[in-house]
Amino acid sequence: MTGQLIQYGRHRKRRSYARISEILELPNLIEIQTKSYDWFLKEGLIEMFKDISPIEDFTGNLSLEFVDYKLGEPKYDLDESKNRDATYAAPLRVKVRLIIKETGEVKEQEVFMGDFPLMTDTGTFVINGAERVIVSQLVRSPSVYFNDKVDKNGKVSFGATVIPNRGAWLEYETDAKDVVFVRIDRTRKLPITVLLRALGFSTDQEIIDLLGDNEYLRNALDKDNTESTEAALLEIYERLRPGEPPTVENAKSLLYSRFFDPKRYDLASVGRYKMNKKLHLKHRLFNQVLAEPIVNTETGEIVAEEGTLLDRRNLDQIIDVLESNANQKVYDLDNGLLDEPIEIQSVKVYVPGDEEKRTTTIIGNAFPDDEVKCITPADILSSVSYFFNLLAGVGFTDDIDHLGNRRLRSVGELLQNQFRIGLSRMERVVRERMSLQDTESVTPQQLINIRPVIASIKEFFGSSQLSQFMDQANPLAELTHKRRLSALGPGGLTRERAGMEVRDVHYSHYGRMCPIETPEGPNIGLINSLSSYARVNEFGFIETPYRKVDIETNTVTSQIDYLTADEEDAYVVAQANARLDDNGKFLDDEVVCRFRGDNTVMARERMDYMDVSPKQVVSAATACIPFLENDDSNRALMGANMQRQAVPLMNPEAPFVGTGMEHVAARDSGAAVVAKYKGRVEHVEARQIKVRRIVEEGGKEIETDLDVYKLAKFARSNSGTCYNQRPIVEAGNIVTKGEILADGPSMELGEMALGRNVVVGFMTWDGYNYEDAVIMSERLVKDDVYTSIHIEEYESEARDTKLGPEEITRDIPNVSDNALKNLDDRGIIFVGAEVRDGDILVGKVTPKGVTELTAEERLLHAIFGEKAREVRDTSLRVPHGADGIVLDVKVFNREDGDELPPGVNQLVRVYIVQKRKIHVGDKMCGRHGNKGVISRILPEEDMPFMPDGTPIDIMLNPLGVPSRMNIGQVLELHLGMAAKNLGLHVASPVFDGANDEDVWSTIEEAGMARDGKTVLYDGRTGEPFDNRVSVGVMYMLKLAHMVDDKLHARSTGPYSLVTQQPLGGKAQFGGQRFGEMEVWALEAYGAAYTLQEILTYKSDDTVGRVKTYEAIVKGENIPRPGVPESFRVLMKELQSLGLDVKVMDNKDEEIEMRDLEDDDFVDSKINIAKAPMPEAEITE
C-alpha cells in the first residue's frame, strides 16, 4: 500500500499520496479581508482624523479638532438586517474639540458621524439586506519609475516618472536631440534645468557642479532660456497656469502647493519606503568603481579610496557610514520655497566600460525620515541624478509588471480613501460655517455637517466597481470572491487600455498570485486570485513564505520568512520537492531552483531559501483540482472557474479523489458553522447548536459561558440557490476552536462537496456524445443524484399614487374565484401552495384615473356613498417558467413600524422553491475543464453494463481528451474506481500527488485490471463491445447554466417603442431575431409568403398585427399586410435630413402613410379593448 492515512476534520480520513510533509499550516483564507478591516477600525480611522485636524477658519480664530471616536452597538443584528433589507452597521460617534483662540475657551462634544457598515465574521458586508464583498485592488505603487524604449531607428531613449499616492506627477524624458526635459503634471515639457533653477540652483555652474558635467546636461542648458531662479519660477508658472499674469510670489506658492504641501501631495508610507529604496546611495553604489574617496563627514576619515570596486563585501563594510553621513553636502538655498536646507550625499563613479575614464555623479537623498510623506527637494535632485546616471549606463530601469512595483489596496485602505473624500468635503462646509456662525454661541455640532461623509460611504458600498454582490453559488465561489484581486476600478486600469504585458503571468507572481485562476474573456489577467499561502504586508505588497536555509551549515531550518517580490529577487530559492535528509541537508549536489526569472540548476551551497509547499503557487480553487500537474493550463483554468459555478445539490457527496484542500476551503469559506472557542457540545437541533465553553486556568479545564450557534435553514442565497446548514456534531462531543459544527450548502462531513462521484465510461454511443455532449443514465434522475433546490424571491409593494393609495386585497376586478383559491383573506398566497406561471401571488389594485367630477356629482357621491372609483388589477403574478411551491411569505407594514422606502405603505415578499431534477440540456463538467451538455438520458436498461451487471452512469466522448491535453481526468477516473472498490477516500495534493506508479499499484490493490479498462456489454443487445473501455469513478458537477433558465418561447409580448419590433431576450419576454442571413435562406428557397409575414405581421406592421389578431379570434381570413413601422422610421429619418420622400403606387399616385386609428375597430364585432392585445412598452 502506498500513501498514509490523514485525518481531515472529525469525520473524514483520506489516504494521502503526498511525499512532502506540510511544514506550514495553511493560513486563514479570508484573512486578507478581516485583517484589513480591523486595521481600518483600529488605525485607519484615527489616521484620517489626524490628517484633517485641526480645521481652522480663515482668520485662524476657531480651531476644530477630532480627538477620539467609538463605535456603538449595531441597530439590528446580522439576521435581522438581512430580513429587513437593512444595512448591518454601527453608529460612529466622534469626540470633537472646538477651541476659540481669542478667549481660550474649549468646547468638547460627541458628534454622531453616521452609521458605519460592519464586516461580518466571514469577511462580507450586509448592505440593504444583501451580502457584498469588497474586492482588493492591484495598483501601481507610488514611487519613482525609470523606463527605456527603442524607437524605429534603434535609438534608446529613457523616461522616468515620480508617481505619488495623490498629487502631481513629475516626468523626465529625453528627445531625439538628447535634450533632457521635465513635465509637471502632464503639461508641456520644459528643459530639466528650469526645474533645478526653480529649486534654487540659479547659475549654470552650480547645476554642473551638482550633477557633474555631461553632454545631456549641456544640451538642456543650451535649450534653457532662463537665467535665474525667479525667471525659472515664472516659466513654470506660465506652463501650469497659461493665460494668468505671472508673479514670483504666485509662482512660488504654486510650486509649493503642487509638491511640498502635505494636504495636496502624498506619497503615503509605501511611497516613501519605495523612494528611499530606489534613491539611497547604498542601493546604487553596488558594483561601481569610485572616482573619488568616500569620506565620513563628521570625522573626516576616508572609508573607501578612489578606484575601489564596491562589491557586496566592500559595500557591507561601509554601509553604516553610507547610512549616516558619507559625502554629505548641505545646500542652504534661499529659494523661498522651504526653510530647511537641502541635504544630499554625492559620490562620483566611473562610467562602466568607458575608455576616456569619464565620471558620473550619484546623488542620494540623505535619508529623509519615514514620516515625511511629501516629496523633498533632495528626492527631486536624486531622481534627476538617477536619470543622468541611467544615460551614462549606471542604474537599472524598472519593470512595472513586477509585483514589487504593484501593491494591493484592500478593504481598509479603499474605505479610508473614500472616507477621506467625505471628510474633505465636510471640511469645506465647516470652514464656511465658521465664518458665518456667531463665535460666542457656536458648538461643534453646529459646524459639522455629516451628509457628505455618509454620502461618500454609501456611494462606495452601493456603486463602487470594487463593491460587488457576493457570488454565493457555492462555498468555493464565496471563498474565491473574497480572495479576488482586481486591476480594474477607480485609479486602476481599464479593460480597453490594458495591454498584453499587464495581463501576462510574471515570474514575480510565484507564490503570490495564481497563474491559473483568471476569467476567460476581456478580463483575462486583470482579475486574479491570491495564492494559497500568500499574505499582504503593511505596505500592501504580497508576501509568500519560504523556509530559511542556514548559509554556514547549509541546512534547511524550520524558520519561515515571508518575502515580498523585490526582496526575493536577491535570493536563490530551491523548489519544495528538493530531496532533504533527516537533518535538513540537501541530498543532491545540484538543486533545481529559481533566481529572478530563471529556473536553473545550481550547487546546493548557493541556496538561500526553499519553498514551503508545492501548492503555494496556486489559489484555493486551483488547489482543489487533483492531478493538476497532468492538465494543460488552459483547461485547468476552465476547471478552476467552473467549480465556482457548481450548483449545491440536494444530496452532496465529497469526492473520492480529493486534494486535501476540500476541508480547509469549506472551513474558511464562511458557509459552514465553525466553533469560535474550545468547548463541549450540550445540545444539538436543526436550528441551533449549544456549546459550553472550556477555558484553561492554572492547568485545569473549567467550563464557562454557553455559546449558541444559529443555523440557516432553507434560506435563499445571493445566487437563488438553497442555503441550508446541517449539524455534524453530537451532544457530548468535545470540539476545538475552528472545528466545523455544521455543514453548509455543498458540504459533506466538513469537506467541500460540489458534485457527485459517478461511474463514467469513455466511449461513444450512436453519436450522441458528439462535440462533448454527455449521455446519462436515468438512475441519476430517479435517485435525485443531481437534483438541486432553487429559491426565487418576488416582491410586491403597495405605494401611494397621485390618485390614492394602492391596496393589497383579495377583491380583484375581473378575476375568477378559481384564481383566488390559494389566497388568504388579505389577498396573499398561502405558504405551501403549488403555483404555476400566471397565478396570483399577491392581489393588488391600483386606483384608475377618472375625469374631474362636477359639484353635483360630488354631492351625489357624498350622499349615496357610491361604489368607490374604478381600480385596475396590478397583482403580482408568477412569471414564466417559475412554477414551484411557496416556501415563505414576509409582510412588512408601515403601520407596524417597519422601515420602508418613501411612498411605500406595505411590502410583501414571496419565496417560491423549485426542485430541479437534471434535464437534457443541462451543463455538466468535471474538475479538469471537461465540460459538456447532456444530450440524452437513457433508461438504465439501455446503458452499457460491466461484467458484474452494474450499468455505468455517464458516457463521455474519448475524443475530448487527446486534443485538450487534460489527462488528469483519466488518472482521476482510474484512481477513483480503485478508491471506490477499496472503500476509501484519497488525497492527491497538487504537484505532490499520486504518480502513475501509485495509481497502477492502487488499482492492483483493488483487484482491477492493471490498465484500468474493462469489457462493457451493450444494454440493448447484451453483446460485448468490440474493445475494452476505460471505466472509473469521476467527480462530476452540475453547473448553474440550467436549461430551465434558458428555454423561452413567445406568442405576443412587448414591442420596442420606436421601431415597433418585438424586444429580444428572455428577461423582456422577447422574440427570436430573424436576421439578415435567415432572410437570405428564405429568399433562396423562394418562400415569399413566409418571408412576408415574418417581416410584417410578426414584426412591425402595427395595423396588420391588430387586424390579424382579430381575424384569428373571429376565424376569418388573414388580411393583406400593410407597411412595416421600420419603413416609416426610415422615411422620417430621411425627411429629418431635409429630403422629400413620398411613396407611390404603380399608378404613380401617392400612398398615404397613416397611424393606427381607433375607427379601424368600429366595424369589428369583438371588443378589442378587452382582448389581450400586443402591447407596446417603453423600452428604448
UniProtKB/Swiss-Prot annotation:
State the source organism's domain of life.
Bacteria
Taxonomic classification: Bacteria, Bacillati, Bacillota, Bacilli, Bacillales
The chemistry this enzyme catalyses reads:
RNA(n) + a ribonucleoside 5'-triphosphate = RNA(n+1) + diphosphate
Q: Which GO terms describe its molecular function?
A: DNA binding; DNA-directed RNA polymerase activity; ribonucleoside binding
This protein's GO cellular component annotations are: DNA-directed RNA polymerase complex
| InterPro entries cross-referenced by the UniProt entry | DNA-dir_RNA_pol_bsu_external_1, DNA-dir_RNA_pol_su2, DNA-dir_RNAP_su2_dom, DNA-dir_RNAP_su2_hyb_sf, RNA_pol_bsu_bac, RNA_pol_bsu_CS, RNA_pol_bsu_protrusion, RNA_pol_Rpb2_2
The record, for HAMAP family, names:
RNApol_bact_RpoB
Say which species the protein is native to: Macrococcus caseolyticus (strain JCSC5402) (Macrococcoides caseolyticum)
Q: Which keywords annotate this record? A: DNA-directed RNA polymerase, Nucleotidyltransferase, Transcription, Transferase
Quaternary form? The RNAP catalytic core consists of 2 alpha, 1 beta, 1 beta' and 1 omega subunit. When a sigma factor is associated with the core the holoenzyme is formed, which can initiate transcription.
- Answer whether the UniProt record assigns the keyword Transferase to this protein: yes
What's a Pfam family this protein contains?
RNA_pol_Rpb2_3
Which chain regions cross the lipid bilayer? none
Descriptive protein name: DNA-directed RNA polymerase subunit beta
- Function recorded in the entry: DNA-dependent RNA polymerase catalyzes the transcription of DNA into RNA using the four ribonucleoside triphosphates as substrates.
Q: Name one GO biological process term.
A: DNA-templated transcription
Which EC numbers characterise this protein's activity in its record?
Answer: 2.7.7.6
Q: Which family does it belong to?
A: Belongs to the RNA polymerase beta chain family.
